[in-house]
Protein backbone atom coordinates (compact mmCIF):
# COMPACT_ATOMS: atom_id res chain seq x y z
CA UNK A 1 0.00 0.00 0.00
CA UNK A 2 1.34 3.43 -0.95
CA UNK A 3 2.16 5.78 1.93
CA UNK A 4 3.26 9.34 2.58
CA UNK A 5 6.61 9.35 4.38
CA UNK A 6 8.39 12.21 6.12
CA UNK A 7 12.09 11.82 6.89
CA UNK A 8 13.11 14.76 9.04
CA UNK A 9 16.22 15.95 10.84
CA UNK A 10 18.35 18.88 11.86
CA UNK A 11 20.75 20.46 9.34
CA UNK A 12 23.48 18.41 7.66
CA UNK A 13 22.22 14.99 8.73
CA UNK A 14 22.34 13.46 5.25
CA UNK A 15 18.73 13.90 4.15
CA UNK A 16 19.55 14.50 0.48
CA UNK A 17 22.06 11.64 0.46
CA UNK A 18 19.33 9.35 1.77
CA UNK A 19 16.87 10.64 -0.86
CA UNK A 20 19.32 10.02 -3.70
CA UNK A 21 20.10 6.52 -2.42
CA UNK A 22 16.37 5.73 -2.26
CA UNK A 23 15.88 6.98 -5.83
CA UNK A 24 18.82 4.84 -6.97
CA UNK A 25 17.34 1.77 -5.29
CA UNK A 26 14.08 2.21 -7.24
CA UNK A 27 15.86 2.78 -10.55
CA UNK A 28 18.10 -0.23 -9.97
CA UNK A 29 14.95 -2.35 -9.93
CA UNK A 30 13.67 -0.88 -13.18
CA UNK A 31 11.22 1.49 -11.49
CA UNK A 32 10.76 5.11 -12.52
CA UNK A 33 10.99 7.92 -9.98
CA UNK A 34 10.28 11.63 -9.94
CA UNK A 35 12.42 13.90 -7.73
CA UNK A 36 10.88 17.26 -6.83
CA UNK A 37 12.99 20.19 -5.64
CA UNK A 38 11.88 23.73 -4.67
CA UNK A 39 12.82 26.51 -7.06
CA UNK A 40 14.27 28.62 -4.26
CA UNK A 41 16.94 25.98 -3.58
CA UNK A 42 19.46 26.44 -6.39
CA UNK A 43 22.70 25.79 -4.52
CA UNK A 44 23.74 22.99 -6.90
CA UNK A 45 22.19 24.60 -9.98
CA UNK A 46 18.61 24.93 -11.14
CA UNK A 47 16.80 21.60 -11.10
CA UNK A 48 19.74 19.71 -9.59
CA UNK A 49 19.55 17.82 -6.31
CA UNK A 50 23.00 17.32 -4.78
CA UNK A 51 24.31 15.99 -1.49
CA UNK A 52 27.34 17.20 0.45
CA UNK A 53 29.22 13.98 -0.35
CA UNK A 54 28.96 14.53 -4.10
CA UNK A 55 25.89 12.52 -5.16
CA UNK A 56 23.59 14.35 -7.54
CA UNK A 57 20.55 13.85 -9.77
CA UNK A 58 18.19 15.89 -11.88
CA UNK A 59 15.01 17.07 -10.21
CA UNK A 60 11.75 18.70 -11.29
CA UNK A 61 11.44 22.25 -9.98
CA UNK A 62 8.31 23.37 -8.17
CA UNK A 63 7.22 26.73 -6.79
CA UNK A 64 4.93 27.71 -3.92
CA UNK A 65 1.91 27.79 -6.24
CA UNK A 66 2.69 24.62 -8.21
CA UNK A 67 -0.16 22.10 -8.04
CA UNK A 68 1.80 18.93 -7.28
CA UNK A 69 -0.90 16.34 -7.96
CA UNK A 70 -1.38 17.83 -11.42
CA UNK A 71 2.39 17.91 -11.94
CA UNK A 72 2.62 14.19 -11.14
CA UNK A 73 -0.36 13.36 -13.36
CA UNK A 74 1.23 15.24 -16.29
CA UNK A 75 4.48 13.38 -15.72
CA UNK A 76 2.69 10.04 -15.89
CA UNK A 77 0.79 11.12 -19.03
CA UNK A 78 4.02 12.17 -20.75
CA UNK A 79 6.47 9.52 -19.54
CA UNK A 80 4.49 6.51 -18.35
CA UNK A 81 4.09 4.65 -15.09
CA UNK A 82 5.65 6.22 -12.02
CA UNK A 83 6.66 4.19 -9.00
CA UNK A 84 7.80 6.77 -6.46
CA UNK A 85 7.84 10.54 -5.87
CA UNK A 86 10.67 11.97 -3.76
CA UNK A 87 10.68 15.54 -2.41
CA UNK A 88 13.88 17.32 -1.37
CA UNK A 89 13.80 20.24 1.11
CA UNK A 90 10.20 19.34 1.93
CA UNK A 91 10.03 21.94 4.70
CA UNK A 92 9.41 24.51 1.93
CA UNK A 93 6.14 22.88 0.83
CA UNK A 94 2.95 24.81 1.45
CA UNK A 95 0.06 23.34 3.42
CA UNK A 96 -1.85 22.89 0.15
CA UNK A 97 1.07 21.07 -1.46
CA UNK A 98 1.37 18.60 1.41
CA UNK A 99 -2.33 17.82 0.93
CA UNK A 100 -1.78 17.41 -2.82
CA UNK A 101 1.01 14.92 -2.14
CA UNK A 102 -1.35 12.98 0.12
CA UNK A 103 -3.71 12.81 -2.87
CA UNK A 104 -0.89 11.38 -5.00
CA UNK A 105 -0.67 8.61 -2.40
CA UNK A 106 -4.39 8.05 -1.85
CA UNK A 107 -5.75 8.55 -5.38
CA UNK A 108 -2.82 7.60 -7.61
CA UNK A 109 -1.46 4.90 -5.28
CA UNK A 110 2.11 6.19 -5.59
CA UNK A 111 4.37 6.34 -2.53
CA UNK A 112 5.71 9.81 -1.71
CA UNK A 113 8.96 10.20 0.25
CA UNK A 114 9.59 13.67 1.69
CA UNK A 115 12.89 14.77 3.21
CA UNK A 116 13.33 17.99 5.13
CA UNK A 117 14.10 19.97 8.24
CA UNK A 118 11.63 19.86 11.10
CA UNK A 119 12.37 23.28 12.62
CA UNK A 120 14.06 26.55 11.64
CA UNK A 121 16.88 28.46 13.37
CA UNK A 122 14.40 29.79 15.93
CA UNK A 123 13.19 26.30 16.84
CA UNK A 124 9.85 26.81 15.09
CA UNK A 125 8.19 24.47 12.60
CA UNK A 126 8.33 25.18 8.89
CA UNK A 127 4.93 25.15 7.19
CA UNK A 128 5.68 22.06 5.14
CA UNK A 129 7.09 20.18 8.10
CA UNK A 130 4.11 21.10 10.28
CA UNK A 131 1.62 19.47 7.94
CA UNK A 132 3.84 16.53 7.04
CA UNK A 133 4.10 15.77 10.76
CA UNK A 134 0.31 16.00 10.94
CA UNK A 135 -0.61 14.01 7.84
CA UNK A 136 2.21 11.61 6.93
CA UNK A 137 1.60 7.88 7.36
CA UNK A 138 5.17 7.25 8.46
CA UNK A 139 7.60 9.55 10.29
CA UNK A 140 11.30 8.79 10.61
CA UNK A 141 14.06 10.87 12.15
CA UNK A 142 17.43 10.95 10.40
CA UNK A 143 19.83 11.34 13.29
CA UNK A 144 22.93 13.47 13.59
CA UNK A 145 25.23 14.45 16.46
CA UNK A 146 25.80 17.69 18.36
CA UNK A 147 29.37 18.77 19.18
CA UNK A 148 28.49 17.93 22.79
CA UNK A 149 28.03 14.27 21.86
CA UNK A 150 24.26 14.33 22.34
CA UNK A 151 21.74 13.82 19.56
CA UNK A 152 21.27 17.02 17.54
CA UNK A 153 17.62 17.98 17.14
CA UNK A 154 17.85 21.75 16.60
CA UNK A 155 19.57 24.05 14.11
CA UNK A 156 21.19 27.38 14.96
CA UNK A 157 22.16 30.12 12.53
CA UNK A 158 25.42 31.80 13.54
CA UNK A 159 27.15 35.00 12.46
CA UNK A 160 30.80 35.43 11.47
CA UNK A 161 31.77 35.48 15.16
CA UNK A 162 29.95 32.27 16.04
CA UNK A 163 27.09 33.94 17.89
CA UNK A 164 23.46 32.94 17.40
CA UNK A 165 21.37 34.93 14.91
CA UNK A 166 17.86 35.30 16.31
CA UNK A 167 16.30 37.60 13.71
CA UNK A 168 15.92 37.53 9.94
CA UNK A 169 13.92 35.61 7.35
CA UNK A 170 13.00 32.00 8.05
CA UNK A 171 14.23 30.96 4.61
CA UNK A 172 17.83 31.71 3.72
CA UNK A 173 19.19 29.50 0.95
CA UNK A 174 22.92 28.97 0.68
CA UNK A 175 25.51 29.73 3.28
CA UNK A 176 25.13 26.28 4.84
CA UNK A 177 28.31 26.92 6.80
CA UNK A 178 26.29 29.39 8.92
CA UNK A 179 24.07 26.62 10.24
CA UNK A 180 25.04 24.16 12.95
CA UNK A 181 23.05 21.22 14.29
CA UNK A 182 22.94 21.06 18.08
CA UNK A 183 21.08 19.40 20.93
CA UNK A 184 18.17 21.20 22.56
CA UNK A 185 20.31 21.99 25.62
CA UNK A 186 23.07 23.54 23.48
CA UNK A 187 20.45 25.43 21.46
CA UNK A 188 19.16 27.04 24.64
CA UNK A 189 22.67 28.01 25.75
CA UNK A 190 23.70 29.69 22.52
CA UNK A 191 20.35 31.44 22.16
CA UNK A 192 20.91 32.88 25.64
CA UNK A 193 24.24 34.24 24.42
CA UNK A 194 26.31 31.88 26.54
CA UNK A 195 29.46 31.46 24.50
CA UNK A 196 29.90 30.96 20.79
CA UNK A 197 29.89 28.04 18.40
CA UNK A 198 32.02 27.33 15.37
CA UNK A 199 30.23 26.27 12.18
CA UNK A 200 31.94 22.91 11.94
CA UNK A 201 29.84 21.36 9.19
CA UNK A 202 31.42 22.74 6.04
CA UNK A 203 29.83 21.60 2.78
CA UNK A 204 32.05 19.47 0.58
CA UNK A 205 32.76 20.67 -2.97
CA UNK A 206 30.50 19.13 -5.57
CA UNK A 207 32.06 17.40 -8.58
CA UNK A 208 31.74 19.13 -11.91
CA UNK A 209 29.15 17.43 -14.10
Swiss-Prot record:
It catalyses: thymidine + ATP = dTMP + ADP + H(+). It is an enzyme of class 2 (transferase). GO terms for biological process: DNA biosynthetic process; thymidine metabolic process. The active site is at residue 89. ATP binds at residues 9-16, 88-91. One of its GO terms (molecular function) is thymidine kinase activity. One of its GO terms (cellular component) is cytosol. Keywords: ATP-binding, Cytoplasm, DNA synthesis, Kinase, Nucleotide-binding, Transferase. It comes from the Bacteria. It is found in: Cytoplasm. InterPro entries: P-loop_NTPase (IPR027417), Thymidine_kinase (IPR001267). The keyword NAD does not apply. Its EC number is 2.7.1.21. NCBIfam families: PRK04296.1-5. Homotetramer. Belongs to the thymidine kinase family. HAMAP family: Thymidine_kinase. This is Thymidine kinase. It comes from Xanthomonas axonopodis pv. citri (strain 306).
Amino acid sequence: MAKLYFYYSAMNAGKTTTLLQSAHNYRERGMRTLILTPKLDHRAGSGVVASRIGLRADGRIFERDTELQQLVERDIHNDGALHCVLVDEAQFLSRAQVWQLSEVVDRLRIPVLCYGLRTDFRGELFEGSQFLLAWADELEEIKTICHSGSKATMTVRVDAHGHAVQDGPQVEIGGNERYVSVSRAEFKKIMRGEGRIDPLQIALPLPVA
